[in-house]
Amino acid sequence: MSFISDIKTVKEKDPSVRSSIGIILTHNGMHAVWIYRVSRLFWKVRLKLVAKIISNVGRFFTGVEIHPGAQIGKNFMIDHGTGTVIGETSVIGNNVLLYHQVTLGGTGNDKGNKRHPSLCDNVMVAAGAKILGNIHIGTNAKIGANAVVLK
């Protein structure tokens, strides 16, 4: 978990960012990622109730829901963020960028342990896209705005 690395990622990927202090104080998506990273620490040591409480507080303040069970790689960024949902068994690689109102969710049909999507490295998912179910999105993929991906 590197807050410094997260700040560098936002500076590289978001052209509207002017300063590190601006990210720390106002970048909604980054706040959500930081809250996720803290909740994930509690999840990994089996303090799941604490992790879920932290996650819910984060959702209240940011409008972004990231389940603490999700696995997220380095240099992950959510731009704008509000309405984004990342499910419990989602796996997200390195250098992934999500825009607002993206859902990495389940379909209700997958009854096994893995119910949510896996995104490889260098994936970009545009605003409003829904990626549902236990599916695999390959390296360097770009998912368009408002796309619904089921297979």
Describe these PLM feature segments.
Residues 1-62:
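Terminal amphipathic alpha-helical/low-complexity segments used for targeting or macromolecular assembly
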Residues 62, 67-68, 73-74, 79-88, ...:
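Left-handed beta-helix
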